Amino acid sequence: MSGDDTLARLAAVIESRRGGDPEASYVARLFHKGTDAILKKVGEEATEFVMAAKDGDRPKIVAEAADLWFHAMVALAHFGLTPAQVLAELERREGQSGLEEFALRKVRGREAESTKESGP
């Protein structure tokens, strides 16, 4: 069983909770509370991951990474996005130097800014 399958199954479960009862489902409760609550939880989990990594506690790093991924997937679903889209982006970047990719993003950002400034 591949990681892609695990992510796809988890994404399907998360999506199935979207209209669920907030009293019966943690994910439904997050969806019900909205964007700010979801993003706050992602931030909390990111901080916990960093703290575990700083401590070098390998089992806790894995556990916190799982929490972070899970909550990031809830955020993706909230915005109508899927893990497959993130995986496609990672595949697009595969084999590309991180420095080259960063430089290209900076160029694209400047182009987008100049387009906004010249506007209609």
UniProtKB/Swiss-Prot annotation:
Which SUPFAM superfamilies does this entry report, sorted A to Z?
A: all-alpha NTP pyrophosphatases (SSF101386)
* Membrane recorded as keyword: no
* Transit peptide found in the keyword field: no
GO BP terms: namely: L-histidine biosynthetic process
What GO molecular function annotations does the UniProt record carry, in alphabetical order? ATP binding; phosphoribosyl-ATP diphosphatase activity
What's the superkingdom here? Bacteria
Q: Where in the cell is it found?
A: Cytoplasm
CDD domains named among the record's database cross-references: NTP-PPase_HisIE_like
**Any Pfam family hit:** PRA-PH
What pathway is this protein a component of?
Amino-acid biosynthesis; L-histidine biosynthesis; L-histidine from 5-phospho-alpha-D-ribose 1-diphosphate: step 2/9
* Reactions it catalyzes: 1-(5-phospho-beta-D-ribosyl)-ATP + H2O = 1-(5-phospho-beta-D-ribosyl)-5'-AMP + diphosphate + H(+)
User: What keywords were assigned to this record?
Assistant: Amino-acid biosynthesis, ATP-binding, Cytoplasm, Histidine biosynthesis, Hydrolase, Nucleotide-binding
Family, according to the entry, reads as follows: Belongs to the PRA-PH family.
The name this protein carries in UniProt is Phosphoribosyl-ATP pyrophosphatase
Gene encoding this polypeptide? Answer: hisE
